[in-house]
A protein has these predicted regions:
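Substrate-recognition "cap/lid" segment bordering the active-site pocket of phosphatases
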Residues: 99-151, 157
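Anion (oxyanion) recognition and catalysis
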Residues: 32, 86-90, 164
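Short catalytic/ligand-binding loop motif for oxyanion handling, primarily in non-cytosolic enzymes
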Residues: 21-23, 29, 96, 105-109, ...
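Metal-dependent phosphoesterase signature
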Residues: 37-39, 45-86, 92
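Glycine-rich phosphate-binding loop signature in dinucleotide/nucleotide-binding domains
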Residues: 7, 91-94, 143-149
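Substrate-recognition element of Asp-dependent hydrolases with the DxDx(T/V) motif
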Residues: 72-77, 81-116
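Acidic, Mg2+-coordinating phosphoryl-transfer loop and its flanking beta/alpha structural elements
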Residues: 149-181
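Active-site neighborhood of HAD-like aspartate-dependent phosphohydrolases
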Residues: 3-61
Length: 181
């Protein structure tokens, strides 16, 4: 994967989980397999600990464990993301750069890249993995300088705002947890 000699206006920056891949579905199945049940109204909660009636710390540990498991390499596409990513790439020559707070584990990154390639072909030219749950404000400042006015697609409102502050065009993917944004 590389970004050499690409038209900067044909690059779309995107989060992965909750935008391109259906992380929630994979995580829900994994949690159920491990004996955890969601609380009522879970679909409106972003915090995983709250979704499963546990502390935020316990929820974050389980997220990290899931993100570094083999299951992370087999997530399905979110809604119609596969259709539109492939259409933008194949018919309009767009390339995608993924910025995700997945994990710093190299095996997790390998599985993420493999999952994206299997579903999206060669649409993704780079996958940047930050630590599990890491903020994206600093990296978005860097990418806002490199790709000013390019699209930034995300499902977490504060990350959309950080992208806009960095000079990117922010698009929020709708989920129950961000309906009040």
């Amino acid at each position: 994967m590389g970004v050499k000699n690409m038209k900067k206006d044909k690059i779309i920056l995107t989060d992965c989980d909750g935008v391109i891949l259906d992380w929630e579905e994979g995580f829900s199945v994994w949690m159920e397999h491990h004996g955890h049940k969601k609380v009522e109204g879970y679909q409106f909660l972003y915090n995983i600990g709250q979704r499963y009636g546990m502390s935020s710390e316990a929820g974050n540990k389980l997220v990290k464990q899931f993100n570094e498991s083999a299951a992370i390499g087999f997530l399905p596409p979110l809604r119609d993301a596969q259709f539109f990513v492939k259409k933008l790439h194949e018919q309009h020559q767009y390339k995608f750069i993924c910025i995700t707070s997945l994990s710093l584990d190299p095996y997790a990154k390998y599985l993420r890249e493999r999952n994206l390639k299997k579903l999206m072909g060669d649409a993704f030219i780079d996958v940047i993995c930050l630590d599990t749950g890491a903020d994206k404000d600093k990296i978005l400042k860097d990418y806002g300088i490199k790709y000013p006015n390019n699209y930034w697609i995300e499902d977490k409102p504060e990350n959309v705002d950080w992208g806009i502050d960095a000079g990117l065009k922010g698009i929020l993917i709708e989920h129950g947890h961000n309906m009040d944004y």
